[in-house]
Amino acid sequence: MDNKIVYVVSDSVGETADLVVRAAMGQFPFAPDIRRVPYVEDTGTLKEVISIAKSNQALICFTLVKPDMRQYLLTEAAKEGVEAYDIIGPLIDQIEEITGQVPRYEPGVVRRLDEEYFKKIEAIEFAVKYDDGRDARGILKADIVLIGISRTSKTPLSQYLAHNKRLKVANVPLVPEVDPPEELYQVAKEKCFGLKIIPDKLNHIRKERLKSLGLSDGATYANINRIQEEIDHFEEVISKINCQVIDVSNKAIEETANIIVNAVQNQKMF
């Protein structure tokens, strides 16, 4: 049995069946010849695999989620004297019996979930890398660009959009003494969102921030005149970009995020 052939049949990529077969075969001193047959959608393909397996005296291991396909393979393989092992079917049936829930019978679900997970991780890493204007190159790479003065929820909003919407978000702080990065004027305005807040609200937030750091709330950072100067600068920059502005004064992060997501969906950007 040095070259025992195993046909791995799947209605998706076949990674699950492949891994299970290799794990099982690893318990034996011979090297199997594993041949994967992915994306099987019809009984014609199954019939062909059974015929080939019979001529090669091979074993068929399969992950097919649709009951009719599973039953067809088991029945026809038995008629031809071919050993066929259902890797996932009995477990699906058992879970259905225990939970009373009807399965989706949808191929490739795990793979799609994995892809979504990695998209989320990528978006989170992007938000960290391009947080607070650390690298202006992120502006042109981002799905969303948040623009605002200090303490307008840019960072938590970036993280929320990454975690929950898998969007790559860069955020850019604006201060009167520093010219905005040129990339802000190069990126599509539809991707940009200015975050504004009423002066009194921001004044309170900044004072609380200073107190939490053990600093005097009389610092310039929390001075109402300084805040107004920053807001004026923000409005000047935003008018040049001509992007949508969201008043975050009394909005939760989730509410602001929904406004942004609805806007980009309406524009069919993603």
Swiss-Prot record:
Family as reported in the entry's similarity comment: Belongs to the pyruvate, phosphate/water dikinase regulatory protein family. PDRP subfamily.
Any Pfam family: Kinase-PPPase
Molecular function GO terms recorded: ADP binding; ATP binding; phosphotransferase activity, phosphate group as acceptor; protein serine/threonine kinase activity
PANTHER family: PYRUVATE, PHOSPHATE DIKINASE REGULATORY PROTEIN 1, CHLOROPLASTIC (PTHR31756:SF3)
Residues reported to bind ADP: 148-155
Name of protein: Putative pyruvate, phosphate dikinase regulatory protein
Reactions catalysed, as given in the entry: N(tele)-phospho-L-histidyl/L-threonyl-[pyruvate, phosphate dikinase] + ADP = N(tele)-phospho-L-histidyl/O-phospho-L-threonyl-[pyruvate, phosphate dikinase] + AMP + H(+); N(tele)-phospho-L-histidyl/O-phospho-L-threonyl-[pyruvate, phosphate dikinase] + phosphate + H(+) = N(tele)-phospho-L-histidyl/L-threonyl-[pyruvate, phosphate dikinase] + diphosphate
